[in-house]
Amino acid sequence: MKNILKYIIPVCIIFTLSGYVNAQDEISPERKKAIDSLALEKVRDLSKYISIIGDKATDQAEASRVMDRAEELFVEEAEIGVSSLNREQVNYYKVRQYLMRLNQLNYDKVMIKWYNIHYISDLERQPDGKYVGVITVYQRFEGISDDGLTYKDTTKKDITIYVEKKKTQIRGRIIEFWDVLLGDIRVTETTS
C-alpha cells in the first residue's frame, strides 16, 4: 500500500500542477478583447505598409524600411497569396518576396486599399498552447500605366492570426504577455 501511495501522490501533484499551468494559459474575456483589438490593429498596420510599399511615390529607402516593419508582423514562414483576373491560379510568396514584387510592379500608379476587416473565426486554443484565429479583409487594387491601361480587382483574403504567451525581462523581472503574429494570407475570391 505504501508503494502505491508513493507513486499516486506525485502523479496527483503533477496533474494538479499541470491543470494550474493550463489555467494560467487560458485567455480571459477581457484579455481576449484586448488581443482581438491588437490583432485588428496589426492587420490595419499591414494595410498601411502595403499601400506605402506599392505607392510609386515612395522612395526605395523608405520602402525598404517599411518592408522591414511589415515583415516583423508575421510568423517566420508565412506566405501571401497573389491572384489576378487574368488567371485562375493563386501564387504564394514568402512575405519579403511578396513585398519586393509589390514594390516593383510595372504600373506608373498603384493604389491598394483594404476594407471590411473583421474576424471570421474566434480564437481557438491549439495543442501547443497557441491560439489561432482568422481575420478576413477585402483588398481593392488598381494599377494604372502612363499609356492609360488600368487593371482593377477586389480580392477577399483570409489572414491566419497566431496568439502565444511570451516572456521578456524588464529590470530583472520576468514579465509574461500575449503576442499576436500574422500567418499566411490566403486568397479566397477575386472579382472585378
Where are these regions (language model features)?
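Bacterial Sec-dependent N-terminal signal peptides
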Residues: 1-29
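Residues at beta-strand starts and edge strands
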Residues: 9, 129-133, 153-157
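Short, low-complexity N-terminal intrinsically disordered segments enriched in polar/charged residues
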Residues: 22-68
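N-terminal targeting segments with Sec-dependent signals, encompassing both cleavable signal peptides
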Residues: 24-44, 84, 113-127, 173, ...
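Short glycine-rich, low-complexity/disordered patches
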Residues: 52-55, 59-68, 84, 112-117, ...
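Glycine-rich, aromatic-bearing surface loops/beta-hairpins
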Residues: 141-192
